């Protein structure tokens, strides 16, 4: 039960006070008691509940009431059963007794009022009265937790605008309202109560730039909503009529959790006594609701695909046909960014990552725009953000970034359990250097801080700076599986590739050619690849780098060797001794449910079939997966990327609700 104010009574004159339903009000009967009195009794109107905490009563009176010793150890508290119909209609009488004095009486006239600020703290999608049931001032995680949730209103319902909805002080329409959380103020008072009292809605100055509150002034029409709290207004006096009244507010978050903002916002209603115009307003009662801003959540390859994105560039028609066919098989929507918009920047994966935000009443996809800002820089803002599709970005928009700030370097695992700790939404994975140096690269700290601040997908930092491009999607991927943990981790493996080529040579296929059928590309025999000492040394180094990540992933994702599949792949060291794929990197695949779009490796053809494709199919098809090998050699591979780099996927949000986890 909420704590009310302290009421002091005196025999000299009647005391008038307000008691809010659902609060426990302390009654001071000692400080003004007559000097010669040693005990007291209390009688109250039927609408008042009096509780006295002490030892046994001093004496039982003939009328049935009891007396208690008058000492500071006695605690007297009041609660109200019902709201008053008129001012001061509930009475409490305190009678003081002394051994040589007649009884002395003190009168207290109470006005019971109902004032309740309600939000969806039970996370059911509906606002329910919570007076005297739950403490709305705390926010707790877990299936038994409580606390209201806010969405950052980061979509753009007005197609004529270039800004997010949260960047203005207006409510566009009912769709805009649905992106906000409802909060209701319920009051029940005597008709004349607000002649001498007023209500103020307020937010801490440290949080005022993180939230905006609109008041529905006429019903629930969006056109009749006016802003009352926000970056310019930390408080607002409310015009509330007496009697029984409900007032609706719509609340939107303006910022995601980040290193300087834990994501919690407290809105408070204060009841002020304004009866004496010569004195400052006095606080009678406060009620607060704590909201948590919904985090941005990534979706792993194991989530069902809903929409595929790719770019149209010069001479990639065949690539797009293959992606289109794959999307149709997976029953996905396909969005193509035309050449005139992408400015010959085909790296759709690097430009953005599509996740979502969720409250009990609304789920919203949100595109996270990387700070790379190349040819595709306008695509997330102009073509992805829109009605019910949000937008967020972090990091410097000009300069100060590296290749590791592109989102091919940002992945997320499927749900895992690690040493008894559950990660029901998986864990974020991004690449970094193994130690800082003048030559090392790392993901920008602003991006790292943002990802960590979301709390629900605790990030794991991998080692990817050994790669020329430096992205984690160059050596790992996840695919769904029907058994074990529900997925497999795929890792690029030079060791597996050398083993396969050695087996083929042992069977008499040493003359078989890599890159056969690729124009203007030097073909290489299996036997020459196996005897190339420099290439062996390069891949020995790469294997050690991948093995480092292998052990890190096993430890941080709780994986066993049986959860990992090695995909045969060779690398070569180029400028600055950084690695890049020797042939199209098959682990850099597009995963659409059971349909996989894998870079065509152009491996040695043996008995009419590419031995690399055959090996990969033998590893993945037993899991119920269908492998489609896509030719990306000239349009993507030679430009240091593959199928995954050139595509992006919006996936179905988790059925698991993020607020039910414990970070």
Curated annotation (Swiss-Prot):
GO cellular component: cytoplasm; cytosol; nucleoplasm; nucleus; protein-containing complex
Binding site for Ca(2+) 3: 165, 168, 170
Family under the similarity heading: Belongs to the protein arginine deiminase family.
Entry protein name: Protein-arginine deiminase type-4
Recorded consequence of changing residue 639 to Q: Impaired binding of TDFA Inhibitor
Mechanisms controlling activity: Strongly Inhibited by F-amidine and N-alpha-benzoyl-N5-(2-chloro-1-iminoethyl)-L-ornithine amide (Cl-amidine). These inhibitors are however not specific to PADI4 and also inhibit other members of the family. Incorporation of a carboxylate ortho to the backbone amide of Cl-amidine results in inhibitors with increased specificity for PADI4: N-alpha-(2-carboxyl)benzoyl-N(5)-(2-fluoro-1-iminoethyl)-L-ornithine amide (o-F-amidine) and N-alpha-(2-carboxyl)benzoyl-N(5)-(2-chloro-1-iminoethyl)-L-ornithine amide (o-Cl-amidine).
Catalyzed reaction equations: L-arginyl-[protein] + H2O = L-citrullyl-[protein] + NH4(+)
